């Protein structure tokens, strides 16, 4: 990447408090099935620290909500979720929000199941075997992308925009441990930092 002329642009953001605005938001729309997003407002980071948090959050949520996990199987068996259930990390220099989302007849019950699963994992730790399998799978998928010119170009651009080197993700991913993931989960996935957004059908 060739650096361009510095135009002296400055982005100024107001200071963001750690407290959430509200614990839940409910909206209505002409939809067939109620949809929800449960997000956790976590401490923001930048550069390598942001990369580490993103990887840890991705792996921790993947283990917590894996299709073979007690959380996923329990909610599926009780009809609380379907195949749309997924996780996502929404983050940048000044925000970091892990999200769990999908369709449900009872989003409040889903929230309580997730809270209970997080509390259990914080106490006893995540499944180490599943964590290692998920980490190695992510590592392999990342390495495979290096065979694609477009993927490498996107990696270079995204890395430059994030203030990290193109191969920092590979290095960071290979060094993460189950202890790192458990620590992140205990410190960041706090019920008081969670907010539930619900979109339900208009009556």
Give the role of each language-model region.
Residues 1-46, 203:
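An aromatic/glycine/proline-enriched structural segment found at the starts
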Residues 2, 60-61, 72, 115, ...:
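Generic solvent-exposed, charged/amphipathic alpha-helical segments
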Residues 20-22, 31-34, 58, 94-96, ...:
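A generic structural signal for well-ordered coil/turn residues at beta-strand boundaries
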Residues 25, 86-88, 182-186:
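Generic recognition of flexible, low-complexity loop/linker segments
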Residues 35-45, 72-123, 128-176, 193-200:
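M16 family metallopeptidases and their MPP-like homologs
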Residues 38, 49-65, 75:
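Active/ligand-binding-proximal structured segments within catalytic/core domains
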Residues 182-198:
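Bilobed periplasmic-binding protein-like "clamshell/Venus-flytrap" ligand-binding domains
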């Amino acid at each position: 990447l060739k650096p361009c002329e510095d135009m002296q642009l400055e982005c100024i953001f107001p200071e963001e408090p750690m407290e959430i605005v509200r614990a839940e938001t409910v909206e209505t729309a002409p939809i067939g099935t109620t949809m929800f997003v449960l997000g956790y407002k976590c401490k923001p980071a930048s550069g390598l620290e942001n990369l580490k948090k993103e990887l840890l959050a991705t792996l921790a949520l993947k283990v917590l909500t894996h299709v073979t996990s007690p959380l996923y199987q329990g909610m599926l068996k009780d009809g609380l979720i379907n195949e749309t259930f997924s996780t996502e990390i929404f983050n940048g220099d000044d925000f970091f929000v892990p999200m769990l989302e999908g369709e449900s007849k009872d989003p409040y019950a889903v929230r309580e199941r997730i809270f209970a699963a997080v509390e259990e994992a914080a106490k006893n730790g995540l499944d180490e075997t599943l964590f290692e399998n998920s980490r190695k799978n992510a590592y392999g998928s990342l390495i495979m992308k290096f065979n694609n010119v477009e993927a490498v170009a996107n990696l270079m651009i995204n890395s430059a925009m994030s203030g990290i080197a193109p191969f920092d993700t590979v290095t960071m991913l290979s060094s993460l441990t189950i202890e790192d993931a458990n620590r992140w989960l205990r410190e960041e996935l706090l019920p008081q930092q969670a907010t539930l957004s619900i979109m339900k059908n208009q009556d």
